[in-house]
Amino acid sequence: MVNIIKNNKIDKSNMYNIETEQYIEEPWSIIESYFKGHHLERLVRHQLESYNNFVGYQIIKTIEMFNPVHIVSENDYDPVNKKHSLEVFITFENFQMYRPQIHENNGAIKLMFPQEARLRNFTYASAMTIDINIKYIIRTGVNLENSQTICKTLSKIHIGKLPIMLKSNICVLNQYKYVEHTHTGECKYDAGGYFIINGSEKTVLGQERTAENRVYCFNVAKNNTKYIWTAEIKSVPDTKCISPKQTNVMISSKNNGFGNAIYVQMPRIKQVIPLFVVFRALGVLTDKEICEKILLDINHPHHKILLQSLQASVIDSNIYLTQEESIKYITSFAMYTPINMDRETGIKKKLEFTMDILKNDLFPHCQTITQKIYFLGYMTNRLLHARFELIKPDDRDSYINKRIDLTGTLLNNLFRNYFNKLVKDMEKQVNREINNGSWKSTDDYENIINLTNLYKIIKSTTIENGLKRALATGDFGIKHINSNKVGVAQVLNRLTYISSLSHARRVSTPTDKSGKLIPPRKLHNTCWGYLCPAETPEGQSVGIVKNLSYMTHVTIHSNSQPLYEYITPYIIKLENPELTSINIFNKVKVFINGTWLGISEDPYELFISLKEKKYKGIINIYTSIVFDYKMKEIRICNDSGRLTRPVLRVKNKNILIDNDMISKINSGEIIWDNLLTSTSFPESIIEYIDPEEQSWSLIATKPKDIINYSSEQILKYTHCEIHPSSIFGILASCIPFPEHNQSPRNTYQCLDINELVLLSSGEKKRIADINIGDEVISFHPETMETSITKVTHHYIRETIKKIYNIKTISGREIIATEDHKFMTSSGWVEVKDLIPTITKIGIYMNNCYPIKNNSFGTLSCILSEDQFINFFKEQNFKMKLIMKYVSELKNQELLPLYNNNNKISILSRIFGFILSD
């Protein structure tokens, strides 16, 4: 029962009971509603959603990105008129997928079900087709002034097969839900979310990557001799499916007499470019304007040291003062080699290549030149602040800065790569057909590409074999990109039912598992609630392979256009001609997916408005909205790969859920989806937050934390955990009492590091110096026998337990924790329960420490060496034999024998045993 404050009174009928301090069923009612009727879909939801988004959206966008393909032959080029006599334009459209089929040897075609694919070692895959529109432009005449256009369409051209994820939208099992499981051969409790490749079940592990469109500042002085600080960003636009373009802004380690100059490293440019040269290439010419774009307010007293640090860059770039000179300088380092063209054309093409880099490769997530200019200034500003320790360097291991690439994204990257190869091969083949094709005998231009030569031009095996190989081997790496993506696809673990579900929720960091870096393996505080803290392998994969918590959701791509429309009334765009750098300073910047759009004069109103739209479901409920008041930024993200999790909303120190809602949940009147938006209630009950939103929230672990026990309480909680157990993954959540130690762990007591341990060789060694593999003499607490044991584990660590110093009458001192057990006359007793001067403890007969004092009062000799010799002389023993016994007794520390010898009690027992009946 939770105590919720109503009208300043505590209602003790809700989710938490203070008197008993125990949860009852209500938190589980909410969790049960999450899984109810959808428990299988929920557990592999991230896999299915990602794949469905790939086949329904990403794959179509990727194909459209290549339109149109322009093909010309150099043999048809007229250098006088600078035209081609024949041009071919090819566009792809109407992408379609078909049900998986089996083509039998007798010519029969039938529907393929997953079970048959398993049994017959088939690949469960769907055929893909596209329509190809071909446009020929034919120019004739002396000056090629006459042009004729011929259009042709080739329909349903096969481009390969795409492996199908079980239970996805295009899976047969999903389309034929009414068919009984006995007919399909499937288990009704199978969650899906995996592939069948050559009869083997394969699941794809989510791959961690650095979040795109975010600026990261690092100190690289230790590992780099050229630069001391760097700010880096990987940019991708919202509207296109392209590979990220990385831009680095770096501070040189070399002092040019005026300080350390700043350089920019751009894609497809061989050498780093001075910062001010890049600004001038973008149209900002004077040094003062450039400094204003970086610092915004150059007269601010806090910016004096930052302004001085730019002096080296000003001097470094004073040779190139115009936009034309700056672009020409950048062009000289462009990775472009003119082929089969004169010098003048080559220079022109190389200049166009550079302009394309500035337009499309430099910050492609920025939509206008103005946004690029301000973003370059923002990036430099962040770098300078980090260098002078005004802000902290970024944390590579924080989950705020990470994204998870799921099956859909990984397959789309492969598909884009192989479709690009298919298009390149197509261009080469069409060129050959134009130059040497059979159409030349009849000048039938329409038949340059026809159904006869089409499958030589478009090779369907390119995409099919590429995707199949990646899923079969687990190697998702792309050759020309040095990406470490081995072991991405794995054979599904079928050891137990729950292990197969857990395998589908696994996440891996694409790094060398044998590497000795510690930070990537540690449990980062930002992954609380998103990744299971317990479920990770032992050995070299520890911390590299992780598992999602059981309520974690991974976002997929969603349209960001509505976000741009919603924030427009609240912001002043950077393109506004009246906006100056001084106006931007001290105003709140507004970012959407890393793109700096403008500033807001009323940021709180914008923040609250966006939050309300999220609660109402007007914008995507998985959208991240953060007001960073320290950096004066509002950051809005709806990109794919963010980890999100549900938490209960708290408003005015009240959880927005009551008994009526709980009753409706239990009765089935309300389902989980009703709790996510305010369509069914005045307020949404549950909010999905990502690690960045979580870092700006105050989340109560239990509802009782929210109760206002005193009017002086200053904590203002924003959210509350549904239940603390939701931090665990599927496997760890099945462990009973996970907050308790396992029983063997409770028996691990501690001794002081200086305590001596007896080795099997008779040598005594400090316990701190014991190594794994050493053989020690151990004592079994039940059989009461000693044995030689090999050390397998060794721990040295601080303890919070009480530490006791035990001194015995014999002079032995032992330092041990309160729970360390000793053998006493009444059995095994912990140190804390020993009673001084009363309890008798058993210690190994060999002294580990010399006797320091005599607790018996007067020290007296019981048997001296002379007494021993004289006694045996009287018995007529030979002197040689007597001296042999003397030597042995001395070795045993029994001669001379004093009344404080710790072996007297043993001698007494032996003596009593001899004299007894």
Feature-to-residue mapping (PLM):
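HINT superfamily self-processing domains
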Residues: K546-S549, H553-P562, Y566-I567, E578, ...
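Conserved tryptophan-centered aromatic signature that marks the ligand-binding surface of SH3
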Residues: Q540-S541, E830
